[in-house]
């Protein structure tokens, strides 16, 4: 453990590890914003197959995110915004629940096959 503190993780310095983590995190955030949100959920941009596949693969690799599930939950959120049927409404479910139990809220939403079939149309089957 002392060697890691002195030599860094696999021989990389702390600043190199931090830089790597920042770059990987940024690519993941851009992938969610561009691919899942703009391209898949709202269809507000067009992406070529190569870049779409890159984003899809990156999200699978870094988050395990399934495109159809994320898209369906997001579309339902817009369709049922701030109602009892909104899958992640901080107004109806409370902000602390969404912030601290967001994964459980999301898993509950994707467990509903009707949500996936109704709002996940046009998405790839990951």
Regions found by a protein language model. Name each.
Residues 1-126:
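Non-catalytic, topology-defining segments of multipass membrane proteins
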């Amino acid at each position: 453990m002392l060697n890691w503190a002195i030599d860094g993780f696999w021989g990389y310095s702390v600043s190199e590890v931090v830089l790597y983590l920042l770059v990987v995190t940024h690519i993941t955030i851009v992938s969610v914003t561009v691919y899942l949100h703009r391209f898949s959920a709202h269809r507000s941009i067009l992406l070529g197959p190569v870049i779409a596949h890159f984003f899809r693969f990156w999200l699978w690799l870094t988050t395990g995110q399934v495109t159809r599930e994320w898209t369906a939950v997001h579309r339902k959120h817009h369709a049922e915004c701030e109602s009892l049927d909104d899958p992640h409404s901080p107004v109806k479910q409370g902000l602390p629940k969404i912030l601290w139990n967001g994964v459980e809220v999301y898993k509950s939403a994707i467990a509903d096959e009707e949500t996936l079939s109704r709002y996940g149309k046009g998405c790839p089957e990951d």
